Amino acid sequence: AVEVQSLVTNSVLPTPRRAVNGVDPSRIAMLVAVLYRHGGISLLQNDLYISTIAGGQAKEPGCDLAITAAMASAALNKPIAKNVCAIGEISLTGQVRPVPRLEYRLREAQRLGFTKAIVPATQKPLKMEGMTLAPATNLKDALAFLHLAKQRH
């Protein structure tokens, strides 16, 4: 399990700054675009700082949903509950895709105190004793579960 933190600030630079630690910078660029296109949250004019805690690495696609949730949370200034984790790869179309060893990841998250998890809707298990699993088909589903869905006017 890897904790991901994100800070979003208004940029005064012509090209906004992207500072990352423990995360693949090219993956962040892709996730920023997907968050804008499929989540309605634009970070294109913002400085973005993303870091993993305690030297952890979030460089595999199964961390996409957690990273994107952290960015959306920071952009909207709405914290994610401490007992919620997010596991899943995000495609360019905004779909939440299956990840290897989901059951192992969920057991580890549960051991660390998480009681709710957003998981790919197309992947088993969709039940786990002592943990509420929220199946997400796409990024909008995941953001809605986290109360981070962008309000349309």
PLM feature segments, named:
Residues 1-153:
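Peripheral, non-AAA+ core regions of ATP-driven protein-machinery
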